[in-house]
């Protein structure tokens, strides 16, 4: 936990938001996206599985969390209200955004359910059937989307994204080159017009002779 807290704090000192993952009870990689169910009692969960995350959240001050594919008992960790809102935000005081692990072609990973239970972002580099909201008009969905946006923006604005050092201004030499190129282009057009007029005039003189 303290290793994770130090890594997160170090990254955040440079304006990087580091994802604490995989939250939680992600105890095996084999078949991890195939409805893997991890069973444990509350004492084991709190004292063994959650303790490193708790230290990373409280001591490291993390502002971004990635949930896991697995189920905790019979509930997907990425849409577990007791875990994401109850423990993470409620008990530990976490402020920031939660993103899913990578969306696969699995029916149980549903964004409409996830966003209502404390998950803010769905991780996928291309569109699948369930990684976007299908309900965007109901009162519960609008409320959940508003909260998710707030969580995401809180994380982003507390990173280096809006640091003045990121502002990129055009170097003087580049501005000078642009001006020179424009002037040369104008000069080239003028010369072409004059050349054409001279050629046309010479043609008329030759014809009259």
Predicted regions and their residues:
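Glycoside hydrolase catalytic-domain context in secreted enzymes
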Residues: 1-208
């Amino acid at each position: 936990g303290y290793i994770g807290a130090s890594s997160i704090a170090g990254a955040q000192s440079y304006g990087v938001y580091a994802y604490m993952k995989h939250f939680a009870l992600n105890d095996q990689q084999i078949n991890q996206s195939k409805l893997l169910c991890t069973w444990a009692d509350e004492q084991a969960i709190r004292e063994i599985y959650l303790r490193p995350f708790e230290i990373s959240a409280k001591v490291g001050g993390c502002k971004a969390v990635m949930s896991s594919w697995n189920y905790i008992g019979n509930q997907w960790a990425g849409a577990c209200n007791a875990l994401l809102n109850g423990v993470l935000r409620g008990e530990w005081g976490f402020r920031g955004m939660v993103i899913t692990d990578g969306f696969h072609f699995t029916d149980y990973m549903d964004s409409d359910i996830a966003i209502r239970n404390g998950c803010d972002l769905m991780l996928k580099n291309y569109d699948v059937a369930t990684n976007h909201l299908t309900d965007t008009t109901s009162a519960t969905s609008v409320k959940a989307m508003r909260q998710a946006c707030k969580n995401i923006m809180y994380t982003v604005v507390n990173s280096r994204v809006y640091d003045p050092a990121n502002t990129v201004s055009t170097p003087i030499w580049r501005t000078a080159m642009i001006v020179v190129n424009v002037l040369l282009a104008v000069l080239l057009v003028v010369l072409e017009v004059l050349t054409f007029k001279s050629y046309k005039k010479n043609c008329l003189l030759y014809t009259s002779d």
